[in-house]
Amino acid sequence: MSIQTKFILFLSSSLFLTPYSVATEKSPQPHDGRLDEQLHLAKPNLPQKTPALLTNNNPSKLSITKEELAKHPDLIIRGLIPAVLQNNGEAVQLLLPLYQPLPKKDPFLLEWAEAIDLREKGYFSDSVKAYRHLFSQKTDLLPLRYQLAQALFLNNDNEAAKDQFQKLRAEQVSSDSVKIIEQYLSALNQRDQWKIQGGFSFLNESNINNAPKAGTKIGNWTAWEKESARGFSYFGNAEKKWSLPHNHFTKLSLEGSGKYYWDNKKYNEFNARAGVGLGYQTARFELSLMPFTEKRWYAGGSSGGNAMKQYSKNSGARLDLSNWLNEKWQISTALEYGEQRYETRKHLNGNNYLASATLLYLAKSGQYWFGGADYNRENTRDLDNAYQRKNVRLGWGQEWKAGISTRLILNYARRAYKEKDLIGIRQKNKEYASVLTIWHRNFHIWGITPKLSWSYQKVTSNHPFYEYDKNRIYVEISKTF
């Protein structure tokens, strides 16, 4: 009897005699957007399965080395067939290198094992291609349909994965298999749900208007005096994706943020931004293009009043790209262009450019590092307000013993203005900033973990009016729904 005949007979008998088992999802924690979100991915909590290879119902166990196994092709084939049927990635990766050199190989069995191997290595797109080729040859194999659906799920081809899981659920499969299929379908539905996040922090500003040292003068010009303010900042974000065929999606993003000071209301502000666009995603890669419009309301600052008024609007487009290079390294980039218009300060009308890149390293489950660089250019009608800003960032997040977590972010930037101002100085600044945040993972208030942050800012400049430093301590509270 040929290898292919044995394989087909085994497939047929296994489908009728035993329910097929399914493997636990294995994917990089992909992470698209903010860092806390990149580290979390909606996925089903699937049961662990016992590898079928080298186990049986007898108390005695078969023990054989890889070298000895290579001398027995029949044992390799007898082990590989149930391994692919049972979606046993570990067994397939053990046996596939031993099966590939054999002179007589079944092409279908070989390609199936290679598809599983690609999935286990994280090459989900290539794995999907292999599974689709296999499935085009044998559409009646339920284990193959399941594994295709799983690979599509891992590759973020949501619509195709949902279609395959729904078809699989309609088959006569075991109740345990139905439960696992429904876990996948539930996870797919969650991917298209609204993601809502909001939070606020208390503010106690001792130098809200970034004033230099008291008494700073340039000729007959005297710098403004410090002002203090107490209040809170707040933000809210809502985002929804709609999955489209072939890994594409549409996306809606709504963002709002502001500051409210009860004892110095002329510094109150509110910003709102809305964007809608298209994107493409796999398990490791995401690309999106989002046209947006943004409005700002502001009370006016030192020369303003207590009521906020429409201050400016900005419309443009943003291109985001995120790619996991492997399980530990991720690179994210963003390009943005906007046209900015002011209600009264027409001399600030112009356009703005942003280019940003961040490299993330997940050292282990409780530690991450990141570094980034940003370039920002503001073009305004009056050239003394136009500038270029170049920034570098470093960050470190750590989970410590006793439930303590910390996050440290350091920034350094250079800002250079295009022309001299009224005093005759072409401003060049060096900007330093740091934020240290600490919280206890087991301390919650209504399901929310408060975080204590200390921030420090310092600006040195060739323009004495724009040199200052300040620090503040604040409590940060946020929640994702």
Curated annotation (Swiss-Prot):
Record's keyword terms, sorted: Cell outer membrane, Membrane, Signal, Transmembrane, Transmembrane beta strand
Keyword Membrane among record annotations: yes
Predominant location category: membrane
Topology versus the membrane: Multi-pass membrane protein
Disulfide bonds: none
Subcellular location: Cell outer membrane
Region (N-terminal domain): 25-192
GO CC terms in record: cell outer membrane
Matches recorded under InterPro entries: Slam_C_b-barrel
UniProt key word Signal: yes
Residues covered by region (C-terminal probable beta barrel): 193-481
Transmembrane segments: 194-204, 233-243, 248-258, 271-281, 285-295, 315-325, 329-338, 353-363, 368-377, 390-400, 405-414, 432-441, 448-458, 471-481
Coiled-coil ranges per UniProt: none
One Pfam entry name: SlipAM
Domain of life per record: Bacteria
Signal peptide segment: 1-23
Family from the record: Belongs to the Slam family.
Role of this protein: Required for correct export to the cell surface of some cell outer membrane lipoproteins.
Name of the molecule in the record: Surface lipoprotein assembly modifier 1
Species for this entry: Haemophilus influenzae (strain ATCC 51907 / DSM 11121 / KW20 / Rd)
